[in-house]
Amino acid sequence: MGNSPSTQDPSHSTKKEHGHHFHDAFNKDRQGSITSQLFNNRKSTHKRRASHTSEHNGAIPPRMQLLASHDPSTDCDGRMSSDTTIDKGPSHLFKKDYSLSSAADVNDTTLANLTLSDDHDVGAPEEQVKSPSFLSPGPSMATVKQTKSDLDDLSTLNYTMVDETTENERNDKPHHERHRSSIIALKKNLLESSATASPSPTRSSSVHSASLPALTKTDSIDIPVRQPYSKKPSIHAYQYQYLNNDETFSENSQMDKEGNSDSVDAEAGVLQSEDMVLNQSLLQNALKKDMQRLSRVNSSNSMYTTERISHANNNGNIENNTRNKGNAGGSNDDFTAPISATAKMMMKLYGDKTLMERDLNKHQNKTKKAQNKKIRSASNSRRSSFASLHSLQSRKSILTNGLNLQPLHPLHPIINDNESQYSAPQHREISHHSNSMSSMSSISSTNSTENTLVVLKWKDDGTVAATTEVFIVSTDIASALKEQRELTLDENASLDSEKQLNPRIRMVYDDVHKEWFVPDLFLPAGIYRLQFSINGILTHSNFLPTATDSEGNFVNWFEVLPGYHTIEPFRNEADMDSQVEPTLDEELPKRPELKRFPSSSRKSSYYSAKGVERPSTPFSDYRGLSRSSSINMRDSFVRLKASSLDLMAEVKPERLVYSNEIPNLFNIGDGSTISVKGDSDDVHPQEPPSFTHRVVDCNQDDLFATLQQGGNIDAETAEAVFLSRYPVPDLPIYLNSSYLNRILNQSNQNSESHERDEGAINHIIPHVNLNHLLTSSIRDEIISVACTTRYEGKFITQVVYAPCYYKTQKSQISN
């Protein structure tokens, strides 16, 4: 396919026939095929067939006509040939033959080391050689052989654009070395053409086209050299190449380049200016490098940002705040908040600023949280020192005042109007004029708006010495206090509080009142359960509402209602049990007056009074507690609800009214009723029970003895007389049903014992009829209700008879 053979046939070198250049070109075209390489002995056969065709037919194949159209001045390599007269006119970039060798070996071996010469053909002339026994393997195709030589290194090729070797040197070199330069030339030709067409200086510098000489007319082709990608500026200001395949590119050099402001842009992104395929792994590597770069930038400038924002907030300078907001918006003169590469990519491509605003908000929240933690830690240190100085004084003031707490003045919090919506609640100073509540000054206003001061005391045993260890054991209170510490303390203190979480709260002994109490206990609204630990023994107090837990143990409980400043839970029943129970005529103690402000002033002012310490908590649907005296509590709640929750109204006791009249339902006799009214002297003596009067109260033996009249009437007759006067209702349905009796009879017949009578009723009652209330129809103005139970293998049926005057009432209504 364009390669001149290294050996010439002597029969054709001396004799030049007409049209021999077409045949030589055809043979030359066939020598580069797979058939010519595998079967070298068939070359003479091809030549003879070509000459025979030209002599007899005089026709030129189409491929020969194509070759004849060129100028026969040069050969395929662009130089004059002494062997042939066929030349090519214009030079071509692509060669026809890319085979590694065009000449056969001395021993006529092919590329596959195969020969087709037989034993009897050795030494014979070429004309007498028989055609080989193997047929052609297929159509002519180019032979390609893989090589291990590296074409990426331009230094080994010295940027050779044109093969400038002499003719002798080219003939001396092997075939694959003589034509290797054509590939390099084509590559550089393509790169130069693209470089000249592109006006961008960055594109020409990226391919190193400036260092290459000018292109001239060449007969060679080239393949672009694959160079390792490095960080190179692109046409976009925010895009760089992060896809680096060079393993020698260390991370230290990467950091050095990023530190240089001249070579690194702050808006480095993932998109690349080079035309290349981005698969999932390459994209993940690029994003990972972006995140590492941003993390290094954040760590290096986090301290600077925190100090700057803290300084701006402490001074309260509005200009600094506006400048910080402008810097967060994207100013290049000052330090800006780090923005992820994904957010910048979305902004550049689609104009979407959602991700950028989210990154800015996260950065602002992070810096303000760090500032608030520092402020809380400083305020906590001041609060602890202040509380240690005033705790004793406040405790004495509470004890001496007898818990008559005075209302506080309205709070005046100091609020910074320049705080954004992402800022955490700041510490607010509280001005107060009462020494009794000095301990409250150590609590921030955010907690004081939700929490209530709870006074818990132990009053049961006054003989407990001051040296006794008394604790309150409550997981509910401990969890509430833990949440308060997490809100007020910094991060390190909150971690310590989690480790030291203990449901035990120590109580302090009061020498004046001889009781134990818990100082400074502020709790949010809710229901709390607790127990008292006296020298390690868990017990409950009788002065607090009691309940039972899931295990059946007695516990105390109380409820904190919102809107109150101070409460002291205790049970009013304990005080009433210690005194003499009052009679119905005596007036019950009045409920203490409540000094409460209108609901509209809750947000601005708070109060505390003795009356707020409720003797009993209003009823609430707390299912985990079985409260004592729940009926009284429910009644009081209903009364309060009926009076529009007027807590100032006095609770009036209800008087019970008794009567000596017997209801008609229980009157059994001749219909005469006895009503006892007034004094006992007015009551007439009652007749003894008899057959005609109060038969229910009669003794059975006496009753039947009277009916038999001293033995004149037998027992059966007396029973018939009694049933005629007082008829007994029928049996329950399961004992007086023909259907059930028939089923029982069938079961008895199928049983093993056939000696029983057919009419016998099985005494075993179906279990579906047990513990069920059964009744019969109303007959003779009497209704009966029965229930059957099983007891130790026996069945017990209890029947209750009751009169029912349904017909009488119906007749009266009709009349």
From Swiss-Prot:
Belongs to the 5'-AMP-activated protein kinase beta subunit family. Phosphorylated by SNF1 in vitro. Residues 12-31, 72-88, 117-129, 587-596 have a biased composition (Basic and acidic residues). Residues 473-716 are annotated as: Kinase-interacting sequence (KIS). It is found in: Cytoplasm; Vacuole membrane. SUPFAM superfamilies: AMPKBI-like, E set domains. GO terms for molecular function: protein kinase binding. PANTHER family: 5'-AMP-ACTIVATED PROTEIN KINASE , BETA SUBUNIT (PTHR10343), SNF1 PROTEIN KINASE SUBUNIT BETA-1 (PTHR10343:SF87). Component of the SNF1 kinase complex, a heterotrimeric complex composed of the catalytic alpha subunit SNF1, one of the three related beta subunits SIP1, SIP2 or GAL83, and the regulatory gamma subunit SNF4. The beta subunit serves as a bridge between the catalytic and the regulatory subunit. Interacts (via KIS domain) with SNF1. Interacts (via ASC domain) with SNF4. CDD domains: E_set_AMPKbeta_like_N. This is SNF1 protein kinase subunit beta-1. The lineage of its organism: Eukaryota, Fungi, Dikarya, Ascomycota, Saccharomycotina.
